[in-house]
């Protein structure tokens, strides 16, 4: 039995690019202004680093995520922006297998690792650039040599945690 992509929440590549961008901006607008600015700055830096990558967007219960992939499959993501009310991070889908001689990766699961991003400048640090290069090098399917990637809205959850920090 084939899965119905609409039921799974995937809007895949059927959405017009302008509509996908508008929807993505609405996801980002849910965050506090400082996190909106950070998400946009990190996205700009990652688009520059991976100009041919597809961007897979998820607005799920716990996190907003934007993955940079060689295909339309989440497992092919090299890195992702992951954001919640607690801040913004750079997630490595296969981070548990990456060399981390500087010990900057956080997380303890079998697969994913991440770093916290206080600013987009963190992406310029040598140890972060090394992790990104290692993640790209271990990708099963390399990024296309040419062309432009597309923005794909993969999943939107009706119920979500707040994207803004709660008042204390």
Task: Tell me what each language-model feature is.
Residues 1-168:
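Charge-dense, helix-prone N-terminal extensions
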């Amino acid at each position: 039995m084939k899965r119905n992509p609409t039921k799974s929440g995937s809007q895949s590549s059927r959405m017009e690019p302008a509509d996908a961008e508008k929807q993505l901006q609405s996801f980002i607008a849910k965050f506090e202004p400082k996190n909106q600015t950070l998400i946009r700055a990190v996205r700009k830096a990652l688009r520059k680093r991976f100009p041919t990558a597809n961007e897979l967007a998820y607005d799920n219960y716990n996190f907003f995520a934007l993955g940079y992939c060689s295909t339309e499959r989440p497992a092919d993501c090299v890195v992702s922006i992951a954001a919640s009310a607690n801040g913004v991070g750079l997630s490595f889908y296969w981070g548990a297998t990456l060399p981390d001689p500087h010990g900057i990766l956080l997380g303890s699961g079998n697969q994913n690792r991440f770093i916290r991003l206080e600013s987009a400048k963190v992406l310029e640090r040598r140890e972060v650039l090394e992790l990104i290069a290692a993640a790209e090098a271990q990708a099963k399917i390399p990024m296309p040599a040419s062309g432009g990637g597309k923005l794909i809205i993969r999943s939107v959850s009706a119920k979500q945690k707040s994207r803004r920090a709660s008042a204390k």
